[in-house]
Amino acid sequence: PLNFEIESPKVTGKLSNNGYELSGTKILSYNLDIAKKALISFITDDGVYLALIETDQLEITSLDVTSKVPYSKLNLDGVIVSKESIINKSGEGLYLLKNIYARRVLIQASLARGMVLKMLELTAAYTSEREQFDRPIGSFQAVSHRAANMFIDHQELDLNLQQASYLYSSGSDLENQILNLKYITGNVLHRTSYAAQHLHGGMGVAKEYPLWRYCLSAKEHEIINGNSSSALEALSKNITLNQ
């Protein structure tokens, strides 16, 4: 369940007369409460495969998560995957899975960019209006420096997102760029959400104020599909192997 390695799905498939018999669990599966089919990755002696399976054939348990996003736990023990359900050709499963992961990271980074910008705007407005010692707190050097760091983080994420998006659209091999973007996205979300709450003081954690919702979503996107540390570890392995 705590697996961040795309090359080694924890769900395994054993060849049977009707296809493959699966064993394992998927956690944090998204929108299975409304989906008619689930895209499942699993590994066999022949490599990684992807299959579309009808959700009414699966054991799905809804999870009560802090962000209230509709995540589910998926028990795949004993599920039979027919060969007709497999969507990849032999030997191409891992390539397709990495492509899906790349799209997911690009989408996450795009959402993160919007969240960071909104947190920056809320912070700029609040520190311009909130007064202490008869002057806006945004005029204090420490406050303005931390807000400036939020802006720098936003620009860092924006630049790397544009670069990765261009490489993806051009069909380039961008595995390392995607890992780098995942690493940067998590770090930027972590730093800006904490900075925004810090500069807001007590209002930063008030559920009546919109910043709380952005910070909660930022934490979700920081750690979903692996955190920054796992992305950095995978990137360092690729660099060590000259990939």
What positions do the PLM features span?
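A gly/ser-rich beta-alpha-beta helix-loop segment of oxidoreductase catalytic cores
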Residues: 1-15
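Short, surface-exposed charged micro-motifs
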Residues: 10-12, 19, 28
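Alpha-helical interface subdomain recognition
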Residues: 15-20, 102-243
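Short beta-strand micro-motifs in enzyme catalytic cores
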Residues: 20, 38, 49, 70-74
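A short core secondary-structure module
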Residues: 25-58
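Flexible, small-/acidic-enriched active-site or ligand-binding loops
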Residues: 28-29, 54-89
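Residue-level signal for inorganic ion chemistry
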Residues: 40, 51, 74-76, 116, ...
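Helix-biased detector of long, well-ordered alpha-helical tracts
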Residues: 75, 94-107
